[in-house]
Amino acid sequence: MTDRQTDRQTDRQTDRQTDRQTDRQTDRQTDGRTVSQTMNIIFSSDHYYAPYLAVSIFSIIKNTPKKINFYILDMKINQENKTIINNLASAYSCKVFFLPVCESDFQNFPKTIDYISLATYARLNLTKYIKNIEKAIYIDVDTLTNSSLQELWNIDITNYYLAACRDTFIDVKNEAYKKTIGLEGYSYFNAGILLINLNKWKEENIFQKSINWMNKYNNVMKYQDQDILNGICKGKVKFINNRFNFTPTDRDLIKKKNLLCVKMPIVISHYCGPNKFWHKKCSHLNCHIGNLLLKEMDKIIDIPSSWYDHFEKIPFLIKIKRLRKRIKDN
């Protein structure tokens, strides 16, 4: 038996490659449409959010056994963290492309929410950074994927700008706000998870439309790029079940009022709002999984002890391991 055969990462890669070969053989929809063999997923992140980005990526890789290209709209992520994320993706035969974004490009856009970075505005200009792909899934960093993204990826958006889930916090509780930003009579979507038709975005010059909309509603908009996307995409959105973007508000509506029909299983848990999956106060669906994923990642790639400091909900045994890593690092 060779050293290579006993190598943990090689074994995992081999298993993953086998899964993807099987997946490619069945990678067609029942209605006959061919689905792209490579899934394109976009994140936007700065240096501080890199550990959470890695965990979110890992949750996708574990649940979606196929070749994935990850495109990171990169706001000054340092090289060490880039290397860690690249190593994680490579262990599962996936690729990561870091696309430098200059935050000054969006300095005139309003920052109305303290816990949302200006990095989110970068996606308004996606076609500048990402070339030669027709479709992509955009996912916020504050998410954990619970099952395969294949069903989401398969959705036909040929005649739409994007597919998205209703934002029940706005749609159910803030109808008056929609009127304020010109969306009376339209459903309002949460922009944390989007299936994007990049061909349409290029044809319609979405970035210029974003600037025009922002200039008109700058004094009244509250939810940054999410408001902008709702404003410029109204009438061109394919609304999908909230199982693809399950928020704390969705959970509350189901528990208290049963006003929302969500099919099972929940594909993506979205920790929008101030309490994220790495916070002690977070109680949203599967928030504890973030810590477990961090621990599992550490068995696959060597992550720095400082990453554990980013997670408040750390089990006792992981705290011990963190202490040992600090001693070793020093």
Curated annotation (Swiss-Prot):
<keyword id="KW-0464">Manganese</keyword>
<keyword id="KW-0808">Transferase</keyword>
<feature type="binding site">
    <location>
        <position position="270"/>
    </location>
    <ligand>
        <name>Mn(2+)</name>
    </ligand>
</feature>
<feature type="binding site">
    <location>
        <begin position="270"/>
        <end position="276"/>
    </location>
    <ligand>
        <name>UDP</name>
    </ligand>
</feature>
<dbReference type="InterPro" id="IPR050748">
    <property type="entry name" value="Glycosyltrans_8_dom-fam"/>
</dbReference>
<keyword id="KW-0479">Metal-binding</keyword>
<dbReference type="GO" id="GO:0046872">
    <property type="term" value="F:metal ion binding"/>
</dbReference>
<dbReference type="Pfam" id="PF01501">
    <property type="entry name" value="Glyco_transf_8"/>
</dbReference>
<keyword id="KW-0328">Glycosyltransferase</keyword>
<feature type="binding site">
    <location>
        <position position="142"/>
    </location>
    <ligand>
        <name>Mn(2+)</name>
    </ligand>
</feature>
<feature type="binding site">
    <location>
        <position position="140"/>
    </location>
    <ligand>
        <name>Mn(2+)</name>
    </ligand>
</feature>
<feature type="region of interest" description="Disordered">
    <location>
        <begin position="1"/>
        <end position="32"/>
    </location>
</feature>
<comment type="similarity">
    <text>Belongs to the glycosyltransferase 8 family.</text>
</comment>
<feature type="binding site">
    <location>
        <begin position="140"/>
        <end position="141"/>
    </location>
    <ligand>
        <name>UDP</name>
    </ligand>
</feature>
<protein>
    <recommendedName>
        <fullName>Putative glycosyltransferase HI_0258</fullName>
        <ecNumber>2.-.-.-</ecNumber>
    </recommendedName>
</protein>
<feature type="compositionally biased region" description="Basic and acidic residues">
    <location>
        <begin position="1"/>
        <end position="31"/>
    </location>
</feature>
<dbReference type="GO" id="GO:0016757">
    <property type="term" value="F:glycosyltransferase activity"/>
</dbReference>
<feature type="binding site">
    <location>
        <begin position="44"/>
        <end position="49"/>
    </location>
    <ligand>
        <name>UDP</name>
    </ligand>
</feature>
<dbReference type="InterPro" id="IPR002495">
    <property type="entry name" value="Glyco_trans_8"/>
</dbReference>
<dbReference type="InterPro" id="IPR029044">
    <property type="entry name" value="Nucleotide-diphossugar_trans"/>
</dbReference>
